[in-house]
């Protein structure tokens, strides 16, 4: 009660946010007459003026975070004038002037928030305001779209404004090479899809040279259709993977027995739940449970012993996955089979997702079920979730027509506030109440009757369905009724934009899956733009442009115009375009009046989606920019949402109402119940995404550390100091802690193992080197061994030269790190698979996952130090004649160094290849020797080969700065976590350099 009174007095928080921006809108409006007087050259010169202001603001500021703050303050100062400049450029170049509400949308985006704008309110044009403003900083602005078509279209369309104002525009699409990508990212504003941006980030962190990387730092990002990308896509991580050597026979073997299994159900008897049959499917949680009888039958069918035995665990997992593939994954619903390949269908948009694969053997199980070629399981080489990728940006914002229902998730995961932008004109769409039928069949016949009725009046109709299967079922009914219509689903997605653009024409009936052409406006009377393109192509008045040509020369030549049609780029003369476009514009204007008289676009929903957002998106296709329109949902009590999430309530309702066949009901009670079911599913899906993020956050800290170290190595980190002053002492401390404990007398130390480990890690034999260890204390032993090892390293560096040594240090460190990281990702996958079972032992799986993954990561980094040091100390030197040369173990005058060629064993990417030892001096016969193998040239070839293999396997399946190197030496004594830090700060080691280590 008090809340509603306060709202009436002060307005909602959203209204207050918008109200605070109105004075700036007035300020921009006041600048308009002055800006209008400027010539094109003077308007363009404003860009250089703004850039000079920003450069002055960051002068003398070295700290990166402080620089960012200074830039943001400068941009805030420039915003009114910069927005006025963009508004004028839009009017001159595109003949489109930004409305006041669009200026508000632009300010919200600049502030790093989400702007919710209704369909048809011009989100694409709104983005030009913050894009231009933030691009002035010269740090790069990324605009993320849901597909390549929209990225190309928006870059070409809005790029005219940016180019007019002296900025550059780039587009990232699937088929570009690295050089083209680098050029696109170097532009002031870069358009592309979320997948391309994410994969480029992962690929950059697999490169061996900074100049090969394509992306810049992550400064500012605007995500179009932000709900689709940051919410719907968030459950699927980006994965770059490579094939393993596992066979696919097991999938065929398991698939054969599934038809012999009987699906049962869960029966409640009091408090007890009884499972019947061989397995039970839980559609609500998308899981299956195999009964004891089912496991016995499976054991017989497979001809194995106890399925629970450790040697059969893998088989057990494949059986459960195969049952899921057969019972929960339906053809033409979750996937389609096209050209002998299983392609996933996006559950939210209905679009095909070629190249993306389900993980955990599920995709292979579906391939076995469909009898197509089964691809081997892949091993993860690099991975990141969209949540963690987009959190890399210093500033993130987004725009969509439907985000308010997910406000809590945007705030919790991304710290993004949603601001609902007022519409430019009042909304005239009529939202009719839902009608509910008893069965699916009754519902579809009623929908067909309604379409036929509306079609008599020539009113355009857009029908939304939840799957390919259901869109084709309705199509068959309409064919029998003689109603002409167009079907748009994942099977015909190539024509998506074209079909949706014409859905507002007189008498048009369009059946669409949930994609409903997001990103393409439905204009009443038709889309003159598309009609002009069709005519130009039909009459041969436009030529095709290759992707490479389009990437190298993104802008059309003088007097020419470029456009996109069905995913391809074409070019025609400006004169041809103007003439043809004018003709179609006139006919469209005439037809529009007829459509308005018929009532505008009518939206029919045939089923409620799990997410209220998707329903709102469908409704939002009608009534754009104050046009009339209407919407209604037709439902049945057999719909998935009702059947799975409100089954008991539905059966009770049927008995109470005694519904008759073909008679619909309209009830607020049913609508409320449906909304509650949707909210329950949204909550469940949010928990699933949050669960994924909690686990990926653990991995993210490790990824930041590894990628941070990689970036430091590529940027010229002093790896020599890191190796000699940190890694070598760490390894020595480990050896002495294990075989020469401080509390033991020297007589009890394991001298044989100490000697063996020193030879194994460093090729150093203290007996051959003449070091008398008999009377040395633990501390003296450590210092003496370290001193000699350091001199050996410096002698080797002197022998081959500083620059070659730095190069080989970097190459070996990167190779070892990449190999171990790849293995670590595989181990983390295995850990995640089994960690859920810890719950049965009253342990929190997430806490156990954090603890064990930290131990695994620590072990990996220790192995990294050991392998790096071993390779560098055991490198062979080969002379011009190809014969091994003896490497000096003591420093010599610099002019005595011969020009040797370095030879070494390639650093293994799997961490298991044999390690060569130093050629001279040879170790004593008592210690087994290891043979050298190939030259550094071979190492480089091997590195490059493996990198190219890994990058070529990049596909869809689903940095941080790093810490500074610790320079404190730990030789002889190991510093405890609670001991005072040796640096002399007075802090505990774990709170000082121990935290960095």
Curated annotation (Swiss-Prot):
Domain of life: Bacteria
Cofactor note: May bind 1 zinc ion per subunit.
Region entry Disordered, spans: 893-997
EC number: 7.4.2.8
Entry GO terms, CC: cell envelope Sec protein transport complex; cytosol; plasma membrane
Keywords, in A-Z order: ATP-binding, Cell inner membrane, Cell membrane, Cytoplasm, Membrane, Metal-binding, Nucleotide-binding, Protein transport, Translocase, Translocation, Transport, Zinc
Primary localization class, coarse: membrane
Subcellular location: Cell inner membrane; Cytoplasm
GO MF annotation list: ATP binding; metal ion binding; protein-exporting ATPase activity
PROSITE patterns attached to this UniProt entry: SECA (PS01312), SECA_MOTOR_DEAD (PS51196)
Alphabetized InterPro entries for the sequence: Helicase_ATP-bd, P-loop_NTPase, SEC_C_motif, SecA, SecA_CS, SecA_DEAD, SecA_motor_DEAD, SecA_preprotein_X-link_dom
Annotated Pfam families: P-loop_SecA, SEC-C, SecA_DEAD, SecA_PP_bind, SecA_SW
Topological category with respect to the lipid bilayer: Peripheral membrane protein
Gene3D superfamilies associated with the record: 3.10.450.50, Helical scaffold and wing domains of SecA, P-loop containing nucleotide triphosphate hydrolases, SecA, preprotein cross-linking domain
Cofactor(s) this protein cannot do without: Zn(2+)
Reaction(s) the record says it catalyses: ATP + H2O + cellular proteinSide 1 = ADP + phosphate + cellular proteinSide 2
Comp. bias regions, Basic residues: 987-997
Residues annotated for ATP binding in this entry: 102, 120-124, 521
BP term (GO), one: protein transport by the Sec complex
Sequence positions that bind Zn(2+): 981, 983, 992-993
Feature: compositional bias, Basic and acidic residues: 938-953
Function summary: Part of the Sec protein translocase complex. Interacts with the SecYEG preprotein conducting channel. Has a central role in coupling the hydrolysis of ATP to the transfer of proteins into and across the cell membrane, serving as an ATP-driven molecular motor driving the stepwise translocation of polypeptide chains across the membrane.
Subunit structure: Monomer and homodimer. Part of the essential Sec protein translocation apparatus which comprises SecA, SecYEG and auxiliary proteins SecDF. Other proteins may also be involved.
Family: Belongs to the SecA family.
Annotated protein name in UniProt: Protein translocase subunit SecA
Organism: Acidobacterium capsulatum (strain ATCC 51196 / DSM 11244 / BCRC 80197 / JCM 7670 / NBRC 15755 / NCIMB 13165 / 161)
């Amino acid at each position: 009660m008090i809340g509603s009174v306060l709202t009436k007095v002060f307005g909602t928080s959203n209204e207050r946010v918008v109200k605070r921006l109105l004075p700036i809108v007035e300020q921009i409006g006041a600048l308009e007459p002055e800006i209008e007087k400027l010539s094109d050259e003077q308007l363009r010169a404003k860009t250089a003026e703004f850039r000079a202001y920003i450069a002055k603001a960051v002068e003398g500021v070295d700290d990166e975070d402080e620089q960012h703050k200074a830039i943001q303050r400068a941009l805030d100062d420039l915003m009114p004038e910069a927005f006025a400049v963009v508004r004028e450029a839009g009017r001159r170049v595109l003949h489109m002037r930004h409305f006041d509400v669009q200026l508000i949308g632009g300010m919200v985006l600049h502030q790093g928030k989400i702007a919710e704008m209704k369909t048809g309110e011009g989100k694409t044009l709104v983005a030009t305001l913050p894009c231009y403003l933030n691009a002035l900083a010269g740090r790069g602005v990324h605009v993320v779209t849901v597909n390549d078509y929209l990225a190309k279209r928006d870059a070409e369309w809005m790029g005219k404004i940016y180019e007019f104002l002296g900025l550059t525009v780039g587009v990232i699409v699937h088929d570009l090479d690295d050089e083209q990508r680098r050029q696109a990212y170097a532009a002031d504003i870069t358009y592309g899809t979320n997948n391309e941006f994410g994969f480029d980030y992962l690929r950059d962190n697999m490169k061996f040279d900074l100049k090969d990387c394509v992306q810049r730092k992550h400064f500012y990002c605007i995500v179009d259709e932000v709900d689709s990308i940051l919410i719907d896509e968030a459950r699927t991580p980006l994965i770059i993977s490579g094939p393993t050597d596992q066979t696919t026979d097991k999938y065929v073997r398991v698939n054969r027995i599934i038809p012999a299994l009987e699906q049962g159900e869960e029966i409640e008897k009091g408090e007890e739940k009884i499972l019947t049959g061989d397995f039970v499917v839980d559609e609500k949680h998308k899981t299956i449970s195999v009964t004891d009888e089912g496991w016995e039958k499976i054991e017989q069918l497979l001809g194995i012993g106890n399925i629970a035995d450790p040697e059969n665990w893998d088989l057990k997992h494949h059986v459960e996955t195969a049952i899921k593939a057969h019972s929960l994954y339906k053809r033409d619903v979750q996937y389609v089979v096209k050209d002998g390949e299983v392609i996933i269908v996006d559950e939210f948009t209905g679009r095909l997702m070629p190249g993306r694969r389900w993980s955990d053997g599920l995709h292979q199980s579906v391939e076995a079920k469909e009898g197509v070629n089964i691809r081997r399981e892949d091993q993860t080489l690099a991975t990141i979730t969209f949540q963690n990728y987009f959190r890399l940006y210093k500033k993130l914002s987004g725009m969509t027509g439907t985000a308010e229902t997910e406000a809590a998730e945007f705030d919790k995961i991304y710290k993004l506030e949603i601001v609902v932008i007022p519409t430019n004109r009042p909304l005239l769409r009529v939202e009719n109440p839902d009608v509910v039928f008893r069965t699916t069949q009754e519902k579809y016949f009623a929908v067909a009757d309604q379409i036929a009725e509306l079609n008599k009046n020539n009113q355009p109709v857009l029908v939304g369905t939840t799957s390919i299967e259901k869109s084709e079922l309705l199509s068959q009914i309409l064919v029998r009724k003689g109603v002409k219509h167009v079907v748009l689903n994942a099977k015909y997605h190539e024509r998506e934009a074209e079909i949706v653009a014409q859905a507002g024409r007189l008498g048009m009936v369009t059946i669409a899956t949930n994609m409903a052409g997001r990103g393409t406006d439905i204009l009443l009377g038709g889309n003159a733009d598309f009609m002009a393109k069709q005519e130009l192509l039909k009459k041969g008045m436009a030529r095709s442009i290759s992707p490479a040509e389009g990437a190298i020369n993104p802008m059309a030549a003088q007097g020419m115009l470029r456009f996109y049609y069905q995913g391809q780029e074409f070019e025609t003369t400006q004169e041809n375009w103007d003439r043809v476009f004018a003709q179609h514009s006139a006919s469209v204007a005439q037809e529009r009046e007829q459509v308005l008289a018929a009532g505008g676009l009518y939206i029919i929903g045939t089923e409620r989606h799990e997410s209220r957002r998707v329903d709102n998106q469908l409704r939002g296709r009608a009534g754009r920019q104050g046009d009339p329109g209407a919407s209604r949902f037709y439902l049945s009590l057999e719909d998935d949402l009702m059947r799975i999430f409100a089954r008991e309530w539905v059966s009770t309702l049927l008995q109470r109402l005694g519904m008759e066949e073909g008679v619909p009901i309209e009830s607020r009670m049913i609508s409320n119940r449906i909304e509650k079911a949707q909210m329950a599913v949204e909550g469940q899906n949010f928990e699933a995404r949050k669960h994924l993020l909690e686990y990926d956050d653990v991995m993210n800290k490790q990824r930041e550390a590894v990628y941070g170290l990689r970036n430091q190595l590529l940027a010229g980190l002093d790896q020599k100091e890191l190796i000699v002053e940190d890694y070598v002492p760490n390894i020595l401390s480990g050896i002495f802690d294990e075989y020469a404990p401080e509390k033991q007398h020297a007589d009890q130390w394991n001298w044989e193992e100490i000697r063996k480990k020193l030879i194994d890690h460093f090729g150093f034999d203290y007996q051959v080197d003449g070091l008398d260890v008999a009377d040395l204390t633990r501390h003296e032993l450590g210092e003496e061994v370290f001193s000699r090892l350091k001199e050996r390293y410096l002698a080797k560096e002197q022998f081959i030269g500083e620059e070659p040594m730095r190069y080989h240090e970097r190459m070996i460190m990167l190779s070892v790190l990449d190999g171990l990281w790849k293995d670590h990702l595989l181990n983390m996958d295995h850990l995640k698979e089994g960690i859920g079972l810890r719950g049965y032992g009253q342990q929190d799986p997430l806490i156990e996952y954090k603890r064990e993954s930290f131990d695994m990561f620590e072990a990996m980094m220790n192995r990294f130090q050991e392998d790096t040091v071993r390779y560098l100390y055991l490198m062979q030197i080969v002379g011009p004649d190809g014969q091994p040369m003896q490497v000096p173990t003591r420093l010599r005058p610099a002019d005595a160094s011969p020009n040797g060629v370095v030879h070494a064993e390639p650093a293994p990417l799997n961490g298991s290849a044999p390690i060569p030892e130093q050629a001279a001096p040879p170790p004593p016969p008592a210690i087994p020797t290891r043979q050298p193998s190939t030259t550094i040239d071979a190492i480089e070839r091997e590195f490059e080969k493996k990198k190219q293999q890994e990058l070529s396997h990049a596909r869809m399946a689903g940095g941080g700065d790093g810490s500074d190197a610790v320079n404190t030496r730990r030789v002889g004594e190991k510093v405890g976590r609670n001991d005072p830090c040796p640096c002399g700060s007075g802090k505990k080691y774990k709170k000082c350099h121990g935290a960095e280590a």
